[in-house]
Amino acid sequence: DVEVKVFSQNGEDGILDCLFNKLKVDSKNFVEIGVGDYRESNTRFLYQKYHPKGLIIDYIDDMEKKVKPFLNFWKGDLTICKKKIDSKNILDVINKNCNFEIDVFSLDIDSIDYWIIDELKPNISKIFIAEYNHVFGSELEVTVPNISGFERNSYHYSNLCYGMSLKALIKLMEKKDYYFIGSNVQKNNAFFISNDFKKEKFFNNIEIKSLDNYTNSNIRESLNKDSSLSYLSGDKKLKEIEECKVINLKDNKKDLVKIKELLS
């Protein structure tokens, strides 16, 4: 267990530090999309420990004023970009704000993450962290539709229908020249390594036997219609959103279907 939480939401700080040591990567330059005010994020630990170049992106009011006060901002080269990212602007935003080789790319916007990754060039970074939705389980190969301005709590009141399934994410990342090495303990952030770092050399001890090991999460963050927590667990989470429409990506399709149609 290498998970250590310093500034990350869970144990991503420890995982990243371990991966950089394993890959023998000296630079720690990063791009992170979906950072909020940056107090709890996947790359803040890297920034404050190693002072690399970085780009953080989110769409919150007074973002710079909220981020700068608690950082030793002068110690590293951090660009703060206030932008609502979608599949149409992602490449332009990266090209305009990132003038360095990316060592770690992190994406977590609880939204159309699949469609944003789909637009990225292959092998954009050495390490890639992407959030997935464990509620979709291990077998479904789905994502929410590519809706402009997608909001998780608006698409379904339960807050459970967002993002993509782990299986869909892994297949997409394989097309982008990465391989999957596992997730955090909470089972919502997947870690991928560029094929430039051969699995046989760096992670020959890792064997992915079943995706169930990365989707059976005990997180209970579901909401009632009045926005109070409903604490759904197990199969009840997927049952709650069975009427929601998702894109079925199985067999290279992109069919818009209700989740319940995929469960029958």
Label each PLM-derived region with a short phrase.
Residues 1-24, 31, 39, 93, ...:
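Rossmann-like AdoMet/SAM-dependent catalytic core
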Residues 41-42, 66, 115-118, 139-140, ...:
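Short glycine-/acidic-enriched loop or helix-start segments at secondary-structure transitions
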Residues 49-50, 123-124, 176:
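Short, structured coil segments at secondary-structure junctions
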Residues 111-123:
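A short, conserved alpha-helix within the catalytic core of class I
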